[in-house]
Amino acid sequence: MEEHNKNINRRDFLKIVGISAATTTAAATLYSCKQKDGVIPGGSTSTPVPTDKMTYRTSVAQKDRVSLLGYGCMRWPTVPSPDGKGDMIDQDAVNELVDYAIAHGVNYFDTSPVYVQGWSEKSTGIALKRHPREKLFIATKLSNFSNYSRENSIAMYRKSFEDLQTDYIDYYLLHSIGNGGIEAFKARYIDNGMMEFLLKEREAGRIRNLGFSFHGTVDRLYPFPAG
């Protein structure tokens, strides 16, 4: 990568990823809603959840009609592994949750290579594969927190496609920018050439929207010079 691409300011960063692509997802608690006879554990009751009341927002760039409520796939239900060594994702429960969410208007699903001990993307892919791809919006992330190398980062990116069983990703996010400051950001995305790589992937259509996710305060969100 050319040297000038390694010097990024706030304006350049927002121009690259597009501030509108920074998507915040609500972790849906739909499993508790789908209980027999509308009874939620703890003794309270619920009325039937309507299937035609979802609110949608249309993106400016792509004209995607995305549900206001997104499904965060960070904590899928688990069951004990048959070998007794830890837990595994309960795929039947995940399928049921996804079906219920889609039936009630949710069409945005957010995951990551590191969620649920690394199994979220595969489980999410299995569940979503049972539904028409063109009606869904899948978001995942470049979660290269420990190994910043270009080789590892590209391998993580490509495995997301394999596990999610898709040939394009609607929203690809730089995961949790701001943590570690500008030096960590540059190491994860700039110095290793990943930003350049991801921009080319977007041009090729394998990434429809390139954005970022973030946890923290404004001063950590904008650690870049304001040029």
Predicted regions and their residues:
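N-terminal secretory signal peptides
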Residues: 1-12
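C-terminal segment of N-terminal export signals and the immediately downstream linker at the start
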Residues: 29-70, 83
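Glycine-rich, proline-tolerant flexible connector loops at the mouths of alpha/beta enzymes
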Residues: 111-127, 182
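Conserved, mostly hydrophobic/aromatic
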Residues: 59, 71, 109, 124, ...
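Acidic (Asp/Glu)-rich catalytic clusters
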Residues: 61-63, 125-133, 161-165, 225-227
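Glycine/proline-rich, positively charged
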Residues: 80, 149-227
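Acidic/histidine-rich helix-loop elements
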Residues: 73-89
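Alpha-helix-loop-beta-strand connector modules within alpha/beta enzyme cores
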Residues: 125-138, 194-200
